[in-house]
Amino acid sequence: MLLDSHRGYDPGALVMARALARAFRAPLVTSTISRLLVDLNRSIGHPQLFSAATRGAPARLRAKMVEQHYRPYRVQVERLVRQSVSRGQRMIHISSHSFTPELDGKLRCADVGLLYHPGRHEEAELCARWKASLAVFAPQLRVRRNYPYAGKGDGLTSHLRRRFPRGAYVGIELEVNQRIVLAAGRRWTALRGALIDALRTAGAAHGDP
């Protein structure tokens, strides 16, 4: 079923996001709206904002989707970042995703991807430390940076980078291989724990609590 496939949603992303929020006592913004309706991680005007299922819908209906589902989510995230920045704090934003192990017949050679903008020193440094910490906590994991996607591509983190100074906003997209998520069990539980422990270590070294 299309809705249950990787084209409909990111399996495990919500579970991972909740685990991170719990561990760091951080605010959590989530949505359970399928990207088959409207993709909350795409900019207005992006050709993939709407899927093939909704792209041909009347303009009035598409506008309603944006107002009911897209804008409230984006506004809430941006408001939290603005509040943090206005207090003189650095906001580290972890956007939780997962990726299909195989796309268009090609295997994705990673268990975890850490996406960031290579021109943002704070993001590159945090991801380097996170990756290094994961090598200690879970050396069996294949961890790659800016894979399977480029961190500077269209997305919510890219939008927020344009809105806030680089020293104040650090936007990272965490990508987890759905092969581990869908296998469930101990490996998926262990992966969540390793990601949290490694991020805590990386954040401390980065000067963040």
Predicted regions and their residues:
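N-terminal catalytic or cofactor-binding beta/alpha core of small enzyme domains
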Residues: 1-209
